[in-house]
Each structure stands twice: as structure tokens, then as C-alpha cells.
Design a protein with these regions (language model features):
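Conserved acetyl-CoA-binding loop of GNAT-fold acetyltransferases
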Residues: 145-154
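Conserved acetyl-CoA-binding loop-helix of GNAT-fold acetyltransferases
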Residues: 100, 106-119, 142, 146
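Conserved GNAT acetyl-CoA-binding A-motif
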Residues: 114, 121-133
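Conserved functional loop/turn residues at catalytic and ligand-binding sites
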Residues: 61, 97-99, 103-104, 108, ...
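Conserved N-terminal entry element of GNAT/NAT acetyltransferase domains
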Residues: 2-29
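Acetyl-CoA-dependent GNAT
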Residues: 25-91, 96, 101, 114, ...
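Conserved beta-strand-loop-alpha-helix junction that forms the acyl-donor binding cleft
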Residues: 131-140, 159, 163
Length: 163
């Protein structure tokens, strides 16, 4: 990953042009940048944390992680999808996470990553993609609705943490 100052310089250059992203599978070397992007959405973690998680996901054929990389080599965003298998429903793809760098939002990177996820679902013969979005993320809701997703329910989430 480029140093912070070099990354800022590259972002300034890219921001002045239409954004083109190349979608590729995430690699272990991307962990630091993926962690940085996750922090922009309030999910802090270290590069080491991300490497540990990424190692497991990349080894599982029912999970995929892709990055959207600009022409200058900046990872503008990432998406994690997985096959969700439940007893009560047919399997579908769930978007576990989608993060676009705040400097690149609204320029099409998210759309391209979601389209990649949808293609992955169709290639597996699955008929739907499911995504959860925090009730306060109104921009994300508008983004998904613009792509044809519809709100199917609201719910509360619960967690019990074991020390």
C-alpha cells in the first residue's frame, strides 16, 4: 500500500477525472487498505485484524471479496459477498460489506462492485442478492434503491458478546 501522503496525492489526481475502476479479487497485500476503508464507515480494525479475516474468507469458496482499483492503483472500495444458506429459504447471495472511499463516492465504483456481486450470484444459479443497511445510512439506502433493490423489512439486531 502506498504511504499516506502518496495516497493523498494520487487521490487528488484521480478526483479531477472520471473514475474508472478495475475489479479484481482481493489479495492479502490489500489488508491494510481494506482496514483503512472499513474505518471510514465506523468499523475500525488493524491491518493484522483484516489479514486474519481475509485469510479465512479467501479460502472459502462460498465467500468472495473484490476490490475496485483505479487506473493509478488506488483501491477505491471493496465488497464482500457470501452464499447465505438458511433452512427456511433458498440460498441467496448476501452483501456482507461494501465500502467506497469517501473521496470516490458517487462516481460509479459502488455500482460496478455490486454488479460484480450480482454476476457472481447469477453464475451460481441463485436468484437474489440480499443486503442489510443501517437505518441511519440514508445515502446507502438511496444507492441500493437506485440499483433496483427494495426495502423488504426493518428489524432490530441483537448481539451477545462473550469475553
Amino acid at each position: 500500500m502506498a504511504g499516506t501522503e502518496e495516497l493523498k496525492r494520487k487521490i487528488r489526481v484521480v478526483k479531477g477525472r472520471p473514475l474508472k475502476v478495475n475489479i479484481r479479487a482481493a489479495q492479502m497485500e490489500d489488508a491494510g487498505r481494506l482496514a483503512e476503508l472499513s474505518g471510514q464507515l465506523g468499523y475500525p480494525g488493524s491491518a493484522g485484524d483484516m489479514r486474519r479475516r481475509l485469510r479465512h474468507l479467501l479460502a472459502d469458496p462460498e465467500h468472495a471479496v473484490w476490490v475496485g482499483e483505479t487506473e493509478s492503483g488506488i483501491i477505491a472500495g471493496w465488497i464482500h459477498v457470501f452464499v447465505k444458506r438458511l433452512l427456511e429459504n433458498d440460498p441467496e447471495i448476501e452483501i456482507g460489506g461494501l465500502v467506497i472511499d469517501e473521496n470516490f463516492r458517487g462516481q460509479g465504483a459502488g455500482k460496478v462492485l455490486v454488479e460484480r456481486a450480482e454476476g457472481w450470484a447469477k453464475a451460481r444459479g441463485l436468484k437474489s442478492v440480499y443486503v442489510r443497511s443501517n437505518v441511519v445510512r440514508n445515502d446507502a439506502h438511496a444507492f441500493y434503491q437506485k440499483l433496483g433493490y427494495r426495502i423488504i423489512k426493518t428489524q432490530s439486531s441483537f448481539r451477545k458478546t462473550f469475553c
